[in-house]
């Protein structure tokens, strides 16, 4: 058992759900010779020190079998879980992680997650004196994103904590036509999270709230509970994840170009 003077351990959980409306079996889609979930794990592993534990949390034995062939740590979780956060909490409980340990949630469909971003975010969280939860924000760079509900916006307060998240444009510029709204006033949310285990348990043990259900944003549950969410700001948007067949083709091309450049 760790003594109170020892630093908290850092763990990364990569949720990987087999079912997907647009891309069934998405974690196992081949990306330049490897399953996507393997690509994500390799990117995370390359970004972080060996002292950081990394495990994939899935709901399907096919994903388990694929990862075991690559000797990648994997845990089966309840297929009825509604979110990756729930999978993170189950893994943390089953593996007996301490209440002050840091759990980082990296999405399983982000094979191009920038390693410097991930490394800097984890260091930011590890250096924090005290926090329940943290996430990432980047500048919003396209006017079309203001009204795109798939691009989540957020407002950050003076202490570096999230005030609110929304699929709508926040803030709303009352005195300007929309084509004159300054993009510099907006931040875009990136779905990478970190939690203290104690906060993760509290969050997943609390039923969803109306704000969360209306926006379909689970982080609104933390806002509703009054849990502070620290925001790590990164200077540029990361590459988009994989949600469609077009995304698959784009990522394959990027990986091919990157591999050609190294050869």
UniProtKB/Swiss-Prot annotation:
* GO CC aspect terms: cytosol
Q: What is its main location?
A: cytoplasm
* Keywords, alphabetical: Cytoplasm, Lipopolysaccharide biosynthesis, Nucleotidyltransferase, Transferase
Q: What class of enzyme is it?
A: transferase
- Catalytic reaction list: 3-deoxy-alpha-D-manno-oct-2-ulosonate + CTP = CMP-3-deoxy-beta-D-manno-octulosonate + diphosphate
Q: Which residues form the signal peptide?
A: none
The record's section on InterPro entries has: Cytidylyl_trans, KdsB, Nucleotide-diphossugar_trans
| A Gene Ontology biological process term | CMP-keto-3-deoxy-D-manno-octulosonic acid biosynthetic process
Question: Cross-referenced NCBIfam families, in alphabetical order?
Answer: kdsB, PRK05450.1-5
What's its job?
Activates KDO (a required 8-carbon sugar) for incorporation into bacterial lipopolysaccharide in Gram-negative bacteria.
Q: What is this protein called?
A: 3-deoxy-manno-octulosonate cytidylyltransferase 2
| Record organism | Paraburkholderia phytofirmans (strain DSM 17436 / LMG 22146 / PsJN)
């Amino acid at each position: 058992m760790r003594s109170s003077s020892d630093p908290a351990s850092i763990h990364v959980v990569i949720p990987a759900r087999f079912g997907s409306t647009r891309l069934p079996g998405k974690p196992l889609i081949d990306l330049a010779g490897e399953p996507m979930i393997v690509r994500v794990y390799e990117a995370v592993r390359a970004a972080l020190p060996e002292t950081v534990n990394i495990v994939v949390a899935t709901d399907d034995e096919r994903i388990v079998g694929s990862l075991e062939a690559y000797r990648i740590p994997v845990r089966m979780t309840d297929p009825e879980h509604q979110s990756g956060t729930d999978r993170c909490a189950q893994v943390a409980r089953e593996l007996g992680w301490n209440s002050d340990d840091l759990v980082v949630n990296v999405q399983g469909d982000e094979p191009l997650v920038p390693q410097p971003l991930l490394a800097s975010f984890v260091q930011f969280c590890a250096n924090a004196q005290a926090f329940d939860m943290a996430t990432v924000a980047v500048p919003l760079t396209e006017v079309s994103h203001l009204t795109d509900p798939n691009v989540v916006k957020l407002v950050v307060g003076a202490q570096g904590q999230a005030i609110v998240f929304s699929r709508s444009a926040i803030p709303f510029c009352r005195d300007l036509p929309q084509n004159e709204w300054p993009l510099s006033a907006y931040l875009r949310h990136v779905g990478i999270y970190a939690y203290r285990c104690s906060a993760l348990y509290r969050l997943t043990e609390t039923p969803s709230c109306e704000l969360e259900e209306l926006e379909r944003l689970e982080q609104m549950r933390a806002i509703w509970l009054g849990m502070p969410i620290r925001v790590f700001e990164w200077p540029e948007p990361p590459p988009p994840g994989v949600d469609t067949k077009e995304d698959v083709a784009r990522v394959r091309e990027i990986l091919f170009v990157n591999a050609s450049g190294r050869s």
